[in-house]
């Protein structure tokens, strides 16, 4: 595809493996990024969405990427919003999955995570998959967040960053590239009506709702979603 050589898709690693492989095989240059403190990346986690957007820009500059297609899920949607707010000239297309322009987090969940309590992970798994038990390759959260230290140093920091991000309603107005919004009909973490409101705030956008799917779209319905995203990217 002509556009693929100029565009790179950015995913967080591991949870995106089924999607990443598919797009690589379709001749897209796929870049899977572990944020600082996550996966194979060293250093402490970045504690604000704004800092993450700035860090992503440094990565793209370092790699000399002129144009990128960003694909993000949940917290990643906030990161994409803030990136658009600051660096939209680099953007070619955006794909938002299971997210909104604001993502307040239950204080009880934050408290559990800050205390390194494994119940924080159990709660997240319950909310991620409630009403939908069909996902491919097992539940990834157990594999990614394994110890009380991980819960304190990674999960808690990410939850607070999401909770504290308040610029989304302004940032969404800066989006002027083609955008796709994907939501799971059974998502308990991002209400479908909230999601639709988010999508309607962007003029040049398309929305796809996946039946029988919860929050973890790219795992629960990997095969369906990658075909839909490919269709959007080829337009």
What name fits each language-model region?
Residues 9-20:
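The serine-hydrolase catalytic nucleophile loop
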Residues 17, 25, 29-72, 227:
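Active-site loop/oxyanion-hole signature of alpha/beta-hydrolase fold enzymes
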Residues 78-122:
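Flexible "cap/lid" loop of the alpha/beta hydrolase fold
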Residues 111-174:
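Conserved alpha/beta-hydrolase catalytic His-Asp/Glu region
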Residues 175, 181-183, 187:
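Short beta-strand/loop motif that positions the catalytic acidic residue
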Residues 213-226:
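Catalytic histidine-centered segment of alpha/beta-hydrolase-like enzymes
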